[in-house]
Amino acid sequence: MVIGSRILCNAALTKEIESKKKNPLNWGFLEWVYSSAIKEVNRIFPLIRLPNIPLRKLRSLRWEGVRTFNLGVWRKDFIAVNGFDESFQGWGHEDADLAVRLLKIGVKRKDGQFSLPVLHLWHQESSRTNEAENLRRLMARIDDKQTKASIGLNQYI
């Protein structure tokens, strides 16, 4: 699995992107610096490109920090773990659960920071009311042998 990074857009910039008034994909360096200075985006460091060096595999067995906003995984591996576990409700920890199960079947992590940035458009966050239960579910998953999602992809295919 390859984990990239993201640049968060604020609500105003998101609205301008959606209405096609702004297109950050065509921006030069100074436009990005300005956008960061006026807080339209949270950071610009992910735009820096670094070569494909061995450091990208340093955390190959770690699930911590894996977020699925910018994750690449082979289809066969995603199917092998039955995709996302839909027993996770609301916000939190479903991406870490997916990473844990992928690692359990032998998939290695490769960091794509400074290589694969994405723009993350602003949106309302999901409810965090079930975060504690989702965290408990994740901690149990780390300790068990289960590699397939309880409620997952197989219900759709």
Name each model-derived stretch.
Residues M1, N70-G72, V118:
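Conserved hydrophobic/aromatic beta-strand scaffold that supports enzyme active sites
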Residues M1-S36:
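Conserved donor NDP-sugar-binding/catalytic core segment of glycosyltransferases
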Residues C9, G112-T129:
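Active-site donor/metal-binding and catalytic loop motifs
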Residues L13-E18, Q124, N130-E133:
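Short aromatic-enriched loop/helix-cap "lid" or pocket-rim segments at secondary-structure transitions
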Residues S35-G72:
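A recurrent flexible, glycine/aromatic-enriched loop bordering the glycosyltransferase active site
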Residues L61-E64, E86-F88, N154:
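Active-site rim elements
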Residues G65-N82, Q89-K108, Q113:
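A short, conserved alpha-helix in the catalytic core of glycosyltransferases
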Residues T129-L153:
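Catalytic core of nucleotide-sugar-dependent glycosyltransferases
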